[in-house]
Amino acid sequence: MKKILWSFVILFSIPLCSVAQTDTIAGKTHQLREVTISKDRHQRALQSTAPMHVLNRRDMLTMGVTDMADALHRLPGITLRDYGGAGGMKTVSVRGFGAKHTGVSYDGVMLSECQSGEIDLSRYSLDNVDNLTLTVGDNADIFIPARNATTPATLTIQTLRQPSDDLQPHMTAQLKAGSFGYISPFLRYEQCLSNRFSFSAVGEYVYAENDYPYTIKNGVETINDRRNNSRMNSGHAELNFLWNTSSTSQLGGKVYYYDNGRQLPGQVFYYSNTSRESLRDRNFFGQLTFQKRWSEHLSVKWLAKYNWAASLYDDGVVAGWVQDGDYYQREAYTSLAVLYAPDSHWVFDYSVDYAYNNLNSTLPTDTRPYRNTVIQSATAKFHTGRLTVMGRLLYSLYLNGACDGDGAEDMRRLSPSLSLSFELLPQLHLRASYKEIFRAPTFNENYFFHYGSKDLKAENTQQLNAGVTYAGKLSHNTDLTATADLYYNKVTDMIQGVPHNMFVWTCMNIGKAEILGLDVTAKAAHTMGRHTLTAAVNYSMQRARNHTNPESPFYDNQLAYMPLHSGAGSLGWENPWVNISISGHAIGERWSTNEHQNSTHINGYSEVGATIWRRFHIGRPVAEVRFDVKNLFDKQYEIVRNYPMPGRSWQLTINMKF
């Protein structure tokens, strides 16, 4: 109880000021309506002081992006862990840091997962997404909650904006159907009820059998089988509103619900493809965001969120099996940000966040842990002529406890960061950044029976980046953008599971890793009358090495599941008849463990897909028909060892806008 009281004392003893909506520097026009920024998002990414990569809705269409996993392959530095099929869990790590170090923001508010620390991105479809932004280091927008700065990399999911001011109802109806029993209806309704108030409602359902065929080779013997126990039923609904309470203030809100009942296919071994496991994931959250511009120099942003999530796991083999368990987590979260821009060169932000998390389960060993978190961020940004410099100091305080037992160690840390951008030429920018951050252990790492340890320290990370960006014209009808970033990352006190005895593993701080890498991207567009050709490529090199123990035979091995080389590319042709895009990605060889035994080797792979689409009018409604072929050459491969990915598949999408 004392820890909770101290958390509130710290939170509310901080001087509360108010503030104005100018998220970066004077000279960039802002509007309260939909909180839009007049400068093109791609242009801002190229001028950012830290690497920032954007995929907007049009990019996804012209590049033939089919789903969230496909979109993530188009972003540099990302390593995707995919268990296969429409219902397979999908998590991402960025530049070798691991999935627990990747934050995910949904409409400006960070998603929470206090149990495992990993966000499953398979639950977020692209049908309601306006753009995806990957930021490595500090965000160019400093008017953000303090929590948004607590990870080495952040994936921002921005949903479709509210409707225009025509006061007419707008509706989108869509149906997807595809291989392996896949079907997904989607409906979105939006309307401005007045020139100040608008709302939107979204509903989505996904069903898939996921019974795709696969092949295993055992010497000269070939085994052909189909994935089983892989069915999923998933539903998602959300309601959004936006209310301009005055010409200088705005209130927005979101209510979100997700429910997914899925079977869990097990690992595939020779002569074994049996699994009866099932998992039901449920998630509800509601959030409010309020912004007020007090003057030309001062703005304030406040938000609050409540999150509830349940994971109901059934082993399915023996009723009441010891591994069966229902897990429930909750979070209450609030944030206040104050922005002050005294002149056209300087802008300052102070943000303070408070969160309360707890977790309980049906396991007899459950200790019902909880955590109070206070995060403060002080940021300064300076811009003059061709130079932009940003510095941040982040203070994090974690107060841990358990209702039935002892809590983990409390943690507090100061984390600095510094970044800059310099305009060498009108189309050419140089950038450099440095950031320190740390990750508190998850509840599983602290409290899970036998596996967890209350004595764990936080993982510490350091990241250093230097890069160059270019945006210009090769001719009057050909545009080119390109980026190249060289980086060095270091992780110390890495949390790893180690064998305590023959049967029990325990988490300990023993790991150390160093990552040296290179990210390169390029995108070109050429227009000829009613024809447009677009090409986009990205390449990543990640030399992610295990530097835990120089005496170990596994020292300097590539980290598990981290490919040395990866890349993706697409080519699109828009024309008056049928638009076409060809896309593909390739991943180098990997190992499923740091020991690099022959049995843990995973071959590299490449995959190619094709898309055709056409948009046309049927009276006033606008129709769009799209046909995708994934894994065009029917390649057999694995991303996670012993979890085969689907071969060739198709998907038909019919979309109507009224």
Residue ranges, per PLM feature:
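Structural signature of Gram-negative outer-membrane beta-barrels, strongest in the C-terminal barrel
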Residues: A341-N489
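Extracytoplasmic beta-strand/coil segments of soluble accessory domains associated
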Residues: A69, H73-M110
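A beta-strand signature from Gram-negative outer-membrane beta-barrel systems
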Residues: L126-T172
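Gram-negative outer-membrane beta-barrel transporters
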Residues: S344, A482-K490, N509-T593
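Flexible loop and strand-edge segments within Gram-negative outer membrane beta-barrel domains
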Residues: T22, A208-Y214, I223-H236, L242-E331, ...
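C-terminal beta-signal and adjacent terminal beta-strands/loops
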Residues: A586-T593, H601-N603, I612-F658
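Membrane-embedded beta-barrel scaffold of Gram-negative outer-membrane proteins
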Residues: K301-Y313, R431, A458-L516, T521-A525
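N-terminal periplasmic "start-of-domain" segments of outer-membrane beta-barrel proteins
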Residues: Q31-L61
